[in-house]
Curated annotation (Swiss-Prot):
Keyword Nucleus in annotation: no
First-listed, main subcellular location of the protein, grouped into a coarse class: cytoplasm
Keywords, sorted A to Z: Autocatalytic cleavage, Cytoplasm, Decarboxylase, Lyase, Pantothenate biosynthesis, Pyruvate, Schiff base, Zymogen
Protein name (database record): Aspartate 1-decarboxylase
Any coiled-coil regions, as ranges: none
Post-translational modification: Is synthesized initially as an inactive proenzyme, which is activated by self-cleavage at a specific serine bond to produce a beta-subunit with a hydroxyl group at its C-terminus and an alpha-subunit with a pyruvoyl group at its N-terminus.
Organism, scientific name: Burkholderia thailandensis (strain ATCC 700388 / DSM 13276 / CCUG 48851 / CIP 106301 / E264)
Gene name tied to this protein: panD
Localization per record: Cytoplasm
Signal peptide: none
Pathway: Cofactor biosynthesis; (R)-pantothenate biosynthesis; beta-alanine from L-aspartate: step 1/1
Subunit: Heterooctamer of four alpha and four beta subunits.
Active-site annotation: 25 (schiff-base intermediate with substrate), 58 (proton donor)
A GO cellular component annotation in the UniProt record: cytosol
Length: 128
């Protein structure tokens, strides 16, 4: 059996560009793509923390070290500059990979979209 699992996540990145008339996609700083194990043309889901929008597109390379998160084409209508988004990619993982200890790549960024940390699990949510 295969399970559809979270593979990659860039958490709370700020939208830096909205390019309505650019060919559709999301340009992501190449440093972030590599850290999150997302490749060019891979399908990604984007969840806008500010307005609740959730949509899918594909990743393209943004300038390395720029902090770029550019929503292009129709995706540009789903956010405003400065909105915080979660960018996620999923993969089909078989039971053997899961038993062998497969983990996702989770990347956390600062207010300039520079990497401030990473981990391979989502912590248990507790009541506080």
């Amino acid at each position: 059996m295969q399970r559809h699992m979270l593979k990659s996540k860039i958490h709370r990145a700020a939208v830096t560009h909205c390019e309505l008339h650019y060919e559709g996609s999301c340009a992501i700083d190449e440093d972030l793509l590599e850290a999150a194990n997302i490749v060019e043309n891979e399908r990604i889901d984007i969840w806008n923390i500010n307005n609740g929008e959730r949509f899918s597109t594909y990743a393209i390379k943004g300038e390395r070290g720029s902090g770029m998160i550019s929503l292009n084409g129709s995706a540009a209508r789903r956010a405003q500059l400065g909105d915080l988004v979660i960018i996620a990619a999923f993969a089909m993982i078989d039971e053997e990979e899961l038993k062998a200890g497969w983990k996702p790549d989770l990347v956390f960024v600062d207010e300039g979209n520079k990497i401030k940390g990473s981990r391979d699990h989502v912590p248990t949510q507790n009541w506080t």
